[in-house]
């Protein structure tokens, strides 16, 4: 590199990187969007890590040998601290059955797992949080599920099933439930645990394909709404018997997923419909169908925050469908009363533009942002990644009566709290802040609240990443960096493609600089003639005479102008074999297949010489690096100085000007050299078919023939030549390299035994004698001084792609084009490299705290959460007393700067409450466990604070505006939960289609206390049914139950006997009939039916009794064998046991969360003060202060220590002492201190 000659060095460090292109069909399902905010995507055997906000590829992971078929980010549902930091962990699986768990920032494989050698069908990390975070479940074909420890790579257990497993889905509400989609149906597993494999073979159900049911065979044209009516008749889709052969030929179910928005619901996707099942009845309760002319589905993603579905269609269109609220709005007349209660209806609320689908271009997958659920990314087979963002805009009203859909209303809350006056907010922060929750009859007022606006949703394309087109490619790097061009140098790589366009990439950023459509056929070669212009040539397919159309274009990058360099020539002539530009970029040689070569002047674009017919056929050609430009310049300079002397005035002060005038003249001269008369002498050598070497000299427009060197007997037909300094290298078709030392007049042959030498190129940089050699099966780097090989890469041995073209991009990095459609920039050792992300030189800064060091990430979080020591909130870390290396400070500041202006202004808004801030920061960090905790905490802290103000004992009679979304299930308010369950039974009742279903509905109604409806259902039993008598008696019993003592005690006795003899459900029913639901819950808990008991408590018991049941459940969740403390905390939050939650947080060492939670409780006045609580407050605040001290935020530590009262005195003294002496205790000591619990 020339930079060694100058005192300062220029930073042109090119990172090793991979430019990727089209995807392989096996990469179709390999894409995932993690809570960390990044997208991982498989491309052949590499994995791209993409930042969706700036649409940049920030890492490429290379280690797989086969195509990547699945990628999965690990979940972030645990409390983050120094010992369990924010980290980017990704699992990827390939077509050869290998799973790799990556540390994405460093690009290193954390562990590798291999069981069989077939493609992994599906895999996912376990979500049950307090268990191990490292567990990974994978489907190894054909029929095994294996649980792995993703940290160590050890196998925990393995289980086989009778059918081939296609995919699986975890129940998001119950970690022990898992559903497998198999080739014949669905297998439900209810005893999934990480400690041992499932015991049974699971419950198998078969899917009768909806199209084979008789309802569909009716001609649809008979009635106008044929499709709808037919779909309503598809009642049963799930049978326990295996369907007959003609009924189901093939399970064409594309996908199965549990709905994360409500418990016990699942969706099945078929090409033309989505079925929503209620698993308690295993019964369809909703169908989303595509009309005849519509475009079939490929994939659907259910949302958690709202009952909504993102669907991907075969034309690449993404649609959003939102479940319609069942309450009719007041101004809406119910036209079809039956339809209203018939089923769940998902209305199409928004759709994005389709893409142009061709044979090679089709949509593969869509992923949505798991944190906010308002962005979707579409991956297309040609390597494009399209980022669609959902935007909500409010409209006045009633504008969508035309569409016939009930309106959608905006959400009331921002970050869990109703907005205050002039508070800044981000309406499009997440799906649940864009649209309000679905209403439930009997609980919600059907009219929108005062501040709810009607909203419309729109998709906007906010980012696009495109890949390279299909190979083959030809590569050429622009001229190397020198001392002269150092100020304006850009490392540009030109890539010629098969469709005739030339892509120019800037290799510092890896981004496409220009895409130029230059030719009409495949580009065969490119030669740069300056830093901003190049010549490229392309040849068409030969006709029957073997003649082609040659295109040789001159392209100027700055303007994009291209013109045909050879003018009118080029039609019907032999194909151009190669073009070679001389070192001074003065002359160009064009070599043809069966026609003598042409010599052109590059600067004027004129033909200097077309060689005679008897000119030898050229097999290889290279320009010599020697020329006489320097001696010419010296002569010119002498003449110039003589001129200057004659014209100089005799004044003394004039002489000081003289030298500068001359230097100006020289500058002008050197600039105009290329365009003006001066023509230096240059030479080139070439070989003919016999291996004879010719030497030709060109000066101006004279061409002289020089000496000839007879062929070397040991070489075959020469294929290529390279020349640098005093070394000339020849390569032949048999794999021999011949090194000539021109100074010492020595030659040395080396057989490489690798077959045809396709290309050889010397590395740039003065005195750099490395040589890059390309063969049909790979490439090698040679050191020509020592005449020995430095590194080698070979197809099948260390890589699985073929190399199509090579070049040097700097003095120590090479660039390879390969047939998997990628262009790789590699170190000279040619090991395929993932790079460290933190060494990347990105064009746009990326917000991703996970890229920081663990301590720095926690500092950033603490900095954003609370700055109570400042009057105003700042986004500048330098304004805070933060003792840390400047480099780390700089990285934190970069993260802060990369936040969007909206978010910055909201964070700096003094109106943002502590609870909103905690929620917003957990969203920014993609911290699942924080987000869940603060959502529930902020809701119930505010609810209990409100009810305390209005002197109500329980927060039941509240404005329904603010109940928790149903996706929180048992954590919701009882009234809301009850309403939801009643609505659900009503739907099940409408949909029931067999005696089994009717019986289940009657049972549910009895538990919910809806006795009249239950009696009606019981009396429906037909006389020929075996349980006719039993049901009739039950109906009589239900209607005659009065609260007289004797009958109650009898029933209670019968119920307890039933339970003791194993009829738990029946006994519980009887207890519910006589209003002894609390006893029923106790029995359920004794027999381990904890969730069922919690459900019953929510729907039947008053607040005090219900909270007893739920507290017992929380205790059970905390027990070591269950170990779901975080879930127990959420249950306690919903009961308002804030002190207990504070103590639990502190004892689990969640110091930051504990301190902020207690602070919020004190602020809202939901913790009364007594000695116990003061003690807790002191301990929590001191520990948080120590944590802040250990991560370097001293002011924060002082603030919290001073708030801790007595407990904080000692720490305050320590802090002020270190201040006084100016010594900062080392973080290692701090962490030891903070491990001691202060009581």
From Swiss-Prot:
Residues 1215-1226 have a biased composition (Polar residues). Transmembrane segments: none annotated. InterPro entries: WD40/YVTN_repeat-like_dom_sf, WD40_repeat_dom_sf, WD40_rpt, WDR11. Its main location: cytoplasm. It comes from the Eukaryota. Keywords: Cell projection, Cytoplasm, Cytoplasmic vesicle, Cytoskeleton, Golgi apparatus, Nucleus, Phosphoprotein, Repeat, WD repeat. The keyword Iron-sulfur does not apply. It is found in: Cytoplasm, Cytoskeleton, Cilium basal body; Cytoplasm; Nucleus; Cytoplasm, Cytoskeleton, Cilium axoneme. SUPFAM superfamilies: WD40 repeat-like. One of its GO terms (cellular component) is ciliary basal body. Disruption phenotype: Morpholino knockdown causes microphtalmia, microcephaly, melanocyte disorganization, curved body axis, motility defects and narrow trunk. Morphants also exhibit aberrant head cartilage formation and cranial-facial dysmorphology. Gene3D superfamilies: YVTN repeat-like/Quinoprotein amine dehydrogenase. One of its GO terms (biological process) is regulation of smoothened signaling pathway. WD repeats lie at residues 63-112, 115-158, 358-398, 476-515, 571-610, 713-750, 752-792, 798-836, 898-944. Residues 1213-1239 are annotated as: Disordered. Involved in the Hedgehog (Hh) signaling pathway, is essential for normal ciliogenesis. Regulates the proteolytic processing of gli3 and cooperates with the transcription factor emx1 in the induction of downstream Hh pathway gene expression and gonadotropin-releasing hormone production. WDR11 complex facilitates the tethering of Adaptor protein-1 complex (AP-1)-derived vesicles. PANTHER family: WD REPEAT-CONTAINING PROTEIN 11. Component of the complex WDR11. This is WD repeat-containing protein 11.
């Amino acid at each position: 590199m020339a930079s060694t000659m100058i005192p300062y060095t220029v930073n042109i460090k090119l990172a090793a990187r991979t430019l990727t292109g089209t995807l392989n069909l096996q990469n179709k399902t390999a894409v995932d969007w993690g809570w960390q905010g990044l997208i991982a995507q498989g491309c052949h055997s590499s994995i791209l890590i993409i930042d969706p906000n700036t649409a940049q590829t920030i890492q490429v992971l290379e280690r797989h040998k086969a195509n990547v078929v699945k990628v999965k980010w690990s979940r972030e549902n645990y409390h983050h601290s120094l010992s369990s930091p924010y980290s980017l962990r990704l699992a990827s699986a390939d077509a050869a059955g290998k799973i790799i768990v990556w540390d994405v920032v460093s690009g290193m494989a954390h562990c590798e797992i291999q069981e069989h050698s077939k493609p992994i069908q599906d895999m996912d990390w376990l979500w049950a949080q307090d268990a191990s975070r490292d567990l990974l479940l994978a489907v190894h074909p054909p029929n095994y599920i294996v649980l792995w420890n993703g940290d160590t790579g050890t196998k925990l257990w393995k289980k086989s099933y009778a059918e081939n497993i296609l995919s699986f889905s975890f129940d998001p509400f119950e970690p022990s439930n898992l559903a497998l989609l198999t080739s014949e149906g669905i297998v439900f597993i209810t005893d999934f645990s990480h400690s041992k494999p499932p015991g049974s073979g699971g419950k198998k159900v078969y899917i009768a394909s909806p199209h084979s049911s008789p309802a569909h065979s009716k001609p649809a044209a008979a009635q106008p709404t044929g499709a709808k009516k037919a779909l309503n008749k598809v009642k049963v889709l799930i049978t326990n018997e295996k369907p007959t052969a003609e009924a189901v030929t093939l399970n064409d179910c594309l996908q199965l997923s549990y709905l994360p928005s409500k418990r016990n619901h699942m969706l099945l996707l078929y090409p033309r419909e989505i079925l929503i099942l209620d698993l308690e009845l295993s019964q369809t309760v909703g169908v989303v169908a595509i009309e005849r002319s519509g475009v079939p589905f490929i994939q659907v993603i259910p949302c958690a925050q709202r009952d909504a579905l993102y669907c991907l269609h075969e034309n690449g269109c993404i649609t959003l469908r939102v479940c319609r609220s069942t309450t009719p709005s007041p101004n809406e007349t119910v036209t079809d009363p039956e339809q209203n209660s018939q089923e769940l209806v998902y209305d199409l609320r928004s759709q994005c533009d389709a893409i142009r689908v061709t044979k090679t271009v089709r949509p593969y997958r869509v992923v949505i942002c798991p944190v906010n659920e308002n962005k979707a990314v579409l991956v297309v087979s040609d390597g494009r990644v399209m980022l669609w963002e959902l935007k909500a805009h409010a409209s006045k009203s009633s504008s969508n009566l035309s569409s016939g859909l009930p309106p959608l209303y905006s959400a009331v809350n921002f970050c869990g709290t109703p907005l205050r006056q002039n508070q800044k907010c981000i309406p499009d922060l997440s799906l649940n802040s864009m649209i309000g929750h679905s209403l439930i009859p009997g609980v919600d007022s059907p009219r929108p609240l005062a501040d709810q606006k009607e909203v419309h949703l729109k998709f906007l394309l906010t980012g696009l990443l495109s890949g390279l087109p299909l190979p083959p490619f030809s590569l050429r790097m622009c001229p190397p960096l020198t001392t002269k061009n150092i100020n304006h140098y850009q490392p540009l790589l030109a890539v010629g493609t098969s469709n005739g366009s030339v892509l120019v990439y800037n290799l510092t950023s890896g981004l496409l600089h220009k895409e130029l459509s230059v030719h009409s056929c495949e580009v065969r070669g490119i030669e740069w003639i300056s830093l901003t212009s190049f010549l490229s040539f392309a040849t068409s397919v030969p006709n029957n005479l073997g003649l082609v159309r040659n295109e040789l274009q001159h392209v100027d990058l700055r303007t994009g102008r291209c013109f045909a360099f050879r003018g009118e020539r080029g039609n019907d002539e032999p194909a151009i074999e190669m073009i070679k530009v001389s070192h001074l970029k003065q002359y160009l040689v064009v070599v043809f297949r069966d026609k003598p070569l042409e010599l052109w002047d590059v600067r004027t674009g004129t033909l200097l010489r077309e060689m005679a017919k008897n000119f030898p056929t050229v097999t290889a050609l290279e320009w010599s690096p020697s020329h006489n430009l320097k001696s010419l310049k010296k002569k010119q300079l002498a003449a110039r100085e003589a001129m200057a002397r004659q014209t100089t005035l005799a004044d003394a002060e004039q002489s000081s000007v003289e030298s500068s005038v001359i230097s100006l003249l020289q500058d002008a001269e050197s600039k105009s050299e290329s365009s003006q008369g001066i023509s230096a002498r240059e030479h080139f050598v070439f070989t003919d078919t016999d291996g004879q070497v010719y030497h030709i000299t060109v000066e101006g427009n004279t061409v002289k023939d020089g000496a000839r060197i007879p062929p070397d007997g040991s070489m075959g037909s020469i294929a290529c030549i390279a020349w640098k300094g005093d070394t000339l290298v020849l390569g032949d078709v048999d794999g021999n390299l011949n090194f000539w030392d021109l100074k010492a007049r020595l030659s040395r042959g080396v057989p490489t035994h690798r077959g045809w030498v396709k290309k050889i190129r010397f590395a740039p940089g003065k005195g750099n004698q490395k040589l890059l050699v390309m063969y049909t099966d790979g490439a090698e780097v040679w050191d020509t001084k020592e005449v020995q090989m430095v590194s080698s890469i070979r197809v099948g041995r260390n890589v699985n792609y073929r190399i199509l073209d090579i070049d040097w991009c700097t003095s120590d990095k090479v660039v390879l084009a390969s047939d998997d459609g990628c262009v790789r920039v590699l170190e000279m050792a040619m090991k395929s490299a993932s790079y460290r992300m933190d060494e990347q030189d990105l064009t746009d800064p990326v917000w991703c705290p996970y890229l920081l060091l663990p301590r720095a990430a926690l500092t950033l979080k603490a900095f954003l959460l609370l700055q109570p020591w400042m009057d105003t909130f700042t986004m500048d870390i330098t304004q805070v007393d933060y003792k840390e290396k400047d480099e780390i400070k700089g990285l934190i500041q970069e993260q802060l700067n990369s936040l969007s202006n909206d978010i910055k202004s909201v964070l700096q808004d003094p109106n943002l409450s502590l609870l909103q801030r905690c929620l917003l920061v957990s969203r920014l960090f993609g911290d699942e466990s924080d987000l869940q905790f603060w959502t529930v905490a902020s809701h119930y802290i505010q609810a209990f604070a409100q009810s305390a103000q209005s002197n109500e004992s329980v927060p039941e009679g509240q404005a329904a505006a603010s109940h928790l979304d149903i996706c929180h299930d048992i954590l919701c308010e009882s009234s809301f939960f009850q309403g939801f369950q009643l609505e659900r039974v009503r739907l099940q009742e409408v949909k029931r289609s067999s005696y089994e279903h009717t019986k289940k509905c009657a049972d549910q109604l009895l538990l919910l206390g809806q006795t009249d409806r239950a009696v009606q259902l019981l009396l429906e039993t037909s006389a020929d049914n075996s349980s006719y008598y039993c049901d009739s008696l039950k109906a009589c019993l239900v209607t005659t139950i009065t609260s007289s003592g004797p009958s109650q005690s009898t029933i209670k006795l019968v119920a307890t006997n039933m339970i003791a003899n194993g009829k738990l459900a029946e006994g519980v029913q009887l207890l519910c009939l006589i209003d002894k639901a609390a006893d029923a819950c106790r029995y359920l808990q004794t027999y381990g039916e904890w969730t069922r008991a919690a459900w019953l408590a929510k729907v039947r018991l008053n607040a005090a009794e219900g909270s007893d049941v739920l507290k017992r459940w929380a205790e059970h969740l905390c027990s070591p064998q269950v170990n779901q403390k975080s879930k127990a905390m959420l249950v306690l939050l919903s009961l308002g046991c804030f002190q207990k939650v504070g103590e639990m947080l502190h004892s689990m060492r969640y110091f930051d969360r504990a301190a902020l939670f207690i602070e919020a409780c004190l602020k809202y006045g939901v913790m009364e003060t007594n000695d116990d609580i003061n003690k807790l407050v002191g301990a929590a605040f001191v520990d948080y202060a120590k944590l802040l001290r250990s991560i370097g935020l001293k002011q924060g530590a002082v603030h919290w220590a001073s708030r801790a009262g007595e407990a904080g005195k000692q720490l305050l003294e320590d802090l002020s002492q270190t201040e006084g002496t100016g010594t900062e205790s080392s973080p290692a000591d701090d962490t030891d201190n903070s491990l001691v619990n202060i009581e």
